[in-house]
């Protein structure tokens, strides 16, 4: 199915805003036979209702270790695997900080696992406050007495790396595991 990931957030975002950037890492070779991802170059500039003609669709054939980069407005889709072997890839998608991520990273990578990751990776999967007023949480297991909203980094037992306004008194509200 050829599609745009951009529509995951509905149609209220102006087209001039690119909400997402995708990386598709080839763990195995991506070939025409094993269904390499199909992509429509230039489709990020098309109107939403324009459909790709077969001769506009190309397969992103690449050797393992390669990466395909494209935005959420680019038409793309998986190809049909006609081989007997699986095509294995890793899709990492980045979206604007004020948008809900497509994958709920907090459930996919809970704090007890995220604590073992590098701080930069923790931030990339959402364990960071982002801009003012975005990314706070309340711990349902430990209702706060006087401070209810906390930045996500506190779930990992640390404060934000890049926030001067961080108050270290908030750390006492998070139990280490």
Predicted feature residues:
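Catalytic core of non-heme Fe(II) oxygenases with the double-stranded beta-helix
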Residues: 1-61, 99-109
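Short beta->alpha connector loops
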Residues: 6-7, 73-75
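Activation segment
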Residues: 34, 78-79
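Conserved double-stranded beta-helix
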Residues: 46, 50-69, 73, 79-177
């Amino acid at each position: 199915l050829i599609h745009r990931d951009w529509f995951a957030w509905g149609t209220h975002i102006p087209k001039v805003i690119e909400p997402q950037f995708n990386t598709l890492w080839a763990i195995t070779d991506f070939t025409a036979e094993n269904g390499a991802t199909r992509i429509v170059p230039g489709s990020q500039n098309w109107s939403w209702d324009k459909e790709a003609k077969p001769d506009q669709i190309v397969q992103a054939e690449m050797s393992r270790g390669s990466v395909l980069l494209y935005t959420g407005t680019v038409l793309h889709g998986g190809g049909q695997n006609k081989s007997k072997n699986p095509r294995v890839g890793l899709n990492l998608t980045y979206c604007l900080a004020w948008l809900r991520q497509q994958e709920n990273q907090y459930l996919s990578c809970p704090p007890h696992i995220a604590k073992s990751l590098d701080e930069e990776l923790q931030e990339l999967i959402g364990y960071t406050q982002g801009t003012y007023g975005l990314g706070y949480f309340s711990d349902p297991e430990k209702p706060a007495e006087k401070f209810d909203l906390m930045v996500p980094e506190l779930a990992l037992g640390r404060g934000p790396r890049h926030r001067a306004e961080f108050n270290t008194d908030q750390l006492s509200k998070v139990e280490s595991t």
